[in-house]
């Protein structure tokens, strides 16, 4: 019970940082970016309804680029970058668990999808040698490997909450007004918590599951749009 409450709390904090997207979007007041943000979400919903496999593959590729931005140089698009290892390692070490997760996402060929993630994860290990950076990468690879070995797929969640989230907030604080960033994160977390509480109390969970392709497509679209916004404020 306490563990589940903690997971919900951590999820709320993580979701809350997505509201910080509004800082660069509103600061530029570029309607094209705002329109693109909404369009990406709509396209992903439509795409996931038609072909969950392609939708999920695009999400995996975009997420790997996004996670690679957690490491220097952060203003480069790296594919495959070390962020692909974040997704590829669980596919290698927790194959059955990952395959069951892919089946829940209605992936048509889960084994082929796993192989793509594994190849990308292995290829991503070339990055520290190409960059001749042998300091942070071995430490991260060892730590993350241990994390996945102990916690399985939940290790990805812990990585996002305890590494990706602080890095993202730190970068935003360096670039924008720290008070605005922190307050936006707090407000976003409160809004996220209220929405999650409403969904749970009104027992919408079954309805969400019945329409999971729409929900998953929307979530993928929102996260892809978040990754796009991150690329924008990193001046790519």
Residue positions per predicted region:
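Cytoplasmic-side transmembrane-helix entry/capping segments in multi-pass membrane proteins
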Residues: 28-35, 57, 75-85, 134-141, ...
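Membrane-water interface signatures at transmembrane helix termini and the short loops
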Residues: 137-173
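N-terminal signal-anchor module of multipass membrane proteins
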Residues: 1-23, 216-222, 232-235
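Hydrophobic core segments of alpha-helical transmembrane domains in multi-pass membrane proteins
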Residues: 6-14, 53-65, 155-165, 214-220
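C-terminal ends of transmembrane helices
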Residues: 16-27, 62-75, 123-132, 166-175, ...
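Long hydrophobic alpha-helical segments that form multi-pass transmembrane helix bundles
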Residues: 77-129
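Transmembrane helix interruption/hinge and helix-loop junction motifs
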Residues: 1-5, 46-56, 147-156
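Hydrophobic, membrane-inserted alpha-helices
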Residues: 36-46, 61-67, 121-124, 137-146
């Amino acid at each position: 019970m306490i563990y589940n409450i903690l997971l919900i709390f951590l999820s709320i904090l993580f979701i809350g940082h997505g509201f910080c997207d509004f800082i660069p979007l509103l600061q530029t007041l570029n309607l094209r970016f705002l329109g693109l943000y909404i369009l990406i979400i709509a396209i992903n919903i439509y795409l996931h309804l038609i072909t969950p496999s392609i939708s999920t593959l695009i999400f995996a590729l975009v997420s790997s680029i996004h996670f690679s931005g957690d490491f220097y140089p952060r203003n480069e698009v790296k594919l495959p970058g070390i962020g692909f290892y974040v997704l590829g390692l669980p596919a290698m070490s927790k194959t059955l668990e990952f395959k069951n997760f892919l089946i829940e996402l209605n992936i048509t060929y889960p084994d082929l999808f796993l192989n793509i993630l594994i190849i990308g994860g292995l290829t991503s290990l070339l990055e520290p040698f190409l960059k001749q950076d042998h300091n942070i990468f071995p430490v991260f690879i060892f730590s993350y490997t241990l994390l996945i070995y102990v916690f399985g797929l939940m290790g990805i969640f812990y990585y996002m909450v305890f590494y990706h989230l602080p890095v993202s907030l730190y970068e935003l604080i360096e670039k924008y007004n720290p008070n605005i960033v922190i307050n936006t994160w707090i407000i976003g977390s409160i809004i996220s918590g209220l929405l999650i509480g409403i969904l749970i109390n009104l027992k919408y969970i079954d309805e969400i599951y019945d329409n999971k392709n729409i929900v998953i497509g929307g979530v993928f679209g929102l996260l892809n749009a978040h990754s796009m916004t991150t690329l924008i404020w990193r001046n790519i």
